[in-house]
Every structure is written in structure tokens, then in C-alpha cells.
């Protein structure tokens, strides 16, 4: 893992801007708990979170499932996000709602579909955590993972402080102490994330009260930058729903998914234009 200098990121702007919902597709009931979104070979990939089948689903750009891939040998304890690089897909099995889990991991799978695939596990823990008793306001839950340079970066969902701590991991299998490299004062709890290396653009989804969800956009994001970041906040105009995944297309275009909130609704795939 590359040596990373500690930095603290401070929120210096939280202006709420307008945006437009350009496309809105209903997803199959199979994807009621969709919790990650990436693009591989011109298809979306997504997965369900806690307790569902250990499967990656491939969708077209209207949300229709066209393929699925079972991740044999692994359970879906709480798969919360996806990240990709040129060779691999990374599945974030790191949901930890009440700070009780001791089996956090990132599952590493090849991008290319092959019946002889072998999957690897990047197991980790937070060295700052010593108390694994049930906590309603958890500090070591996490739902956002990005691939950046030769590293994986975790954004925690700190309910107690309404911040996001940043932890870095290598991309190689093994057992690790995740290294804290900073904190992002989101003033909300982070539920998903994506990073575009060509644009140096970071996008996070977050919520304050679970009734409203937001996109947090940070430009010129880098592991080596120590300056304060300006965070632009955009309310997602879709009403009461649960948003846990985002994919950057360009500086102004994003796709998100939302979970099914009731028996009369369905999960959704949406395109948003700033």
C-alpha cells in the first residue's frame, strides 16, 4: 500500500443546488435492496445488501436484468457498495449497522466473466474500534467504497457524529488494519459513493433524516491534496426513498438507484442532470 499522509477534510460549503431527474426506470423485485452501482462492459452492475443472495446482477441502461453472477464461496453478510478498476470488481461487505461485526471484508472478483473464476477476500478491521457491543448510533458502519489509484477508500457512515471517516486499504488479499487518513464533515450520513479518476470527481449520497437524500460533490479530490474541500450538496428530487448507490458519467450527469420502500413501490434506476 502506498504511503499516505494524514489529512483532515473540512466542509466549507453546503449550498443546496437544483438538478433534474432525466430518466426513471423501475427495477425488478429481485433488486428491492439494490445498494451499489457500477458500469462494466457497457452494462450496469448492482447487488442487494444484507442477507440476500451473493449475486452480482448485470442490467441494461433501462434497468432490465440481462445476466447474473453468483459469487460462490461467499455470503452476503451486508454488501453495501461496489467499486471497479481496469481488472477487478470490489464488493464491499462492510455494512455494520450497530458496530457489532468482526468479519468485515472486500470481495475481489475479476471483471471478466469466467466459469473458473477465483474470488479473493480483503479482510479488515478498524484499529480504533475496541467496543463491539450494540450501539444504535454506530461509528463504524460504512456504505461507500471507491477505487482510487492503487487503493480502496472506505467512507464510514458515522451516525453518532454525522461525519464520514476515511479509511484506506490495499487491493491485495490479506488481513489488514484499515488506516484512517482523514474525516469528511458531511453533516449527514454517507450511503454510497463513486470516484471518477479522469475528472478527479468524488460523488457521495447521504441522508440526514432518511426522508431526504442528497448528492455531495467534491471536485479535484485526491489522496495527496491537503487543502480544504468545497462540498456542493444537491437534494435528490425523488421523494421519500432510500438511495444507496451512485455512478458518475460526467461532471453533470449521474445515475443512482433507490431501494423498494413498500409493497406498492419498487426499486428504481434514475439518471440525474445537474
Place the predicted regions along the sequence by residue:
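Sequence/structural signature of beta-propeller domains
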Residues: 19-274
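Bacterial Sec-dependent N-terminal signal peptides
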Residues: 1-22
Amino acid at each position: 500500500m502506498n504511503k499516505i499522509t494524514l489529512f483532515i477534510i473540512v466542509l466549507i460549503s453546503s449550498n443546496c443546488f437544483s438538478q433534474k431527474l432525466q430518466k426513471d426506470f423501475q427495477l425488478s423485485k429481485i433488486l428491492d435492496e439494490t445498494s451499489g452501482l457500477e458500469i462494466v462492459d457497457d452494462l450496469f452492475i448492482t447487488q442487494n445488501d444484507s442477507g440476500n443472495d451473493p449475486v452480482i446482477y448485470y442490467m441494461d441502461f433501462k434497468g432490465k436484468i440481462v445476466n447474473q453472477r453468483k459469487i460462490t464461496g461467499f455470503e452476503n453478510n451486508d454488501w453495501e457498495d461496489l467499486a471497479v478498476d481496469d481488472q477487478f470488481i470490489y464488493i464491499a461487505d462492510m455494512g455494520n449497522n450497530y458496530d457489532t461485526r468482526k468479519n468485515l471484508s472486500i470481495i475481489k472478483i475479476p471483471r471478466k466473466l469466467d466459469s473458473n473464476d477465483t474470488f479473493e477476500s480483503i479482510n479488515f478491521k478498524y484499529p480504533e474500534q475496541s467496543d463491539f457491543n450494540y450501539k444504535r448510533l454506530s461509528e463504524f458502519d460504512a456504505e461507500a467504497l471507491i477505487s482510487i489509484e492503487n487503493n480502496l477508500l472506505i467512507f464510514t457512515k458515522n451516525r453518532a457524529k454525522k461525519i464520514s471517516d476515511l479509511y484506506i486499504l490495499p487491493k491485495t488479499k490479506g488481513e489488514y488494519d484499515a488506516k484512517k487518513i482523514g474525516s469528511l464533515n458531511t453533516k449527514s450520513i454517507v450511503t454510497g459513493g463513486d470516484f471518477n479518476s479522469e475528472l478527479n470527481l468524488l460523488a457521495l449520497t447521504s441522508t440526514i433524516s432518511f426522508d431526504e437524500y442528497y448528492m455531495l460533490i467534491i471536485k479535484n479530490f485526491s489522496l495527496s491534496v491537503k487543502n480544504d474541500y468545497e462540498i456542493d450538496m444537491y437534494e435528490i428530487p425523488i421523494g421519500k426513498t432510500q438511495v444507496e448507490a451512485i455512478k458518475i458519467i460526467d461532471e453533470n450527469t449521474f445515475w443512482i438507484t433507490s431501494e423498494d420502500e413498500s409493497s406498492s413501490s419498487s426499486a428504481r434506476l434514475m439518471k440525474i442532470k445537474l
